[in-house]
């Protein structure tokens, strides 16, 4: 039995953005500048608080990132929605990594709390997605809780992140 890869470097993540990792028409990450992490450090089908699997990733922060000059001029901060989107991106990646077919789409989240900010002085953002359930039916649906850390401190939490994989309808 082949072991699944448990970490991905930037070039491998970009290959996913081009549709080369899980095959055309299947889970795909956005390409830069919307790709919100540089590497996936760990991914597993088991473990995490619910023992349903998890994914961990990191994003190197530099003062020249595209969003700092425009959000906000004179008061640069990473938009909170980009951190939330990163959590959805990772949830969809996990479903593709499981071998499930279909194109990933964010569906919803339960609750989101922002308790801190990412500024140009931040060095490292870490993401954690802990799966609660993966449902396989007409669509594949992943449900997970997520967190985001800035330089080691949890600053975002999201519950019940939902991402679906949708198959193309036959004509």
Swiss-Prot record:
Q: Where is the active site?
A: 71
Q: Which InterPro entries match?
A: FabA (IPR010083), FabA_FabZ (IPR013114), HotDog_dom_sf (IPR029069)
**Source domain of life:** Bacteria
Q: Which pathway does the UniProt entry assign to this protein? A: Lipid metabolism; fatty acid biosynthesis
EC number assigned by the record: 4.2.1.59, 5.3.3.14
What Pfam families does its record include?
A: FabA
Q: Where in the cell is it found?
A: Cytoplasm
Q: Which UniProt keywords apply?
A: Cytoplasm, Fatty acid biosynthesis, Fatty acid metabolism, Isomerase, Lipid biosynthesis, Lipid metabolism, Lyase
GO cellular component assignments: cytoplasm
Question: Could you state one GO biological process linked to this protein?
Answer: unsaturated fatty acid biosynthetic process
Q: Which GO terms describe its molecular function?
A: (3R)-hydroxyacyl-[acyl-carrier-protein] dehydratase activity; trans-2-decenoyl-acyl-carrier-protein isomerase activity
Q: Which reaction does it catalyse?
A: a (3R)-hydroxyacyl-[ACP] = a (2E)-enoyl-[ACP] + H2O; (3R)-hydroxydecanoyl-[ACP] = (2E)-decenoyl-[ACP] + H2O; (2E)-decenoyl-[ACP] = (3Z)-decenoyl-[ACP]
Q: How does the annotation summarize its subunit structure?
A: Homodimer.
Role, per record = Necessary for the introduction of cis unsaturation into fatty acids. Catalyzes the dehydration of (3R)-3-hydroxydecanoyl-ACP to E-(2)-decenoyl-ACP and then its isomerization to Z-(3)-decenoyl-ACP. Can catalyze the dehydratase reaction for beta-hydroxyacyl-ACPs with saturated chain lengths up to 16:0, being most active on intermediate chain length.
- Give the record's family classification: Belongs to the thioester dehydratase family. FabA subfamily.
Q: What is this protein called?
A: 3-hydroxydecanoyl-[acyl-carrier-protein] dehydratase
Q: Which organism is it from?
A: Allorhizobium ampelinum (strain ATCC BAA-846 / DSM 112012 / S4)
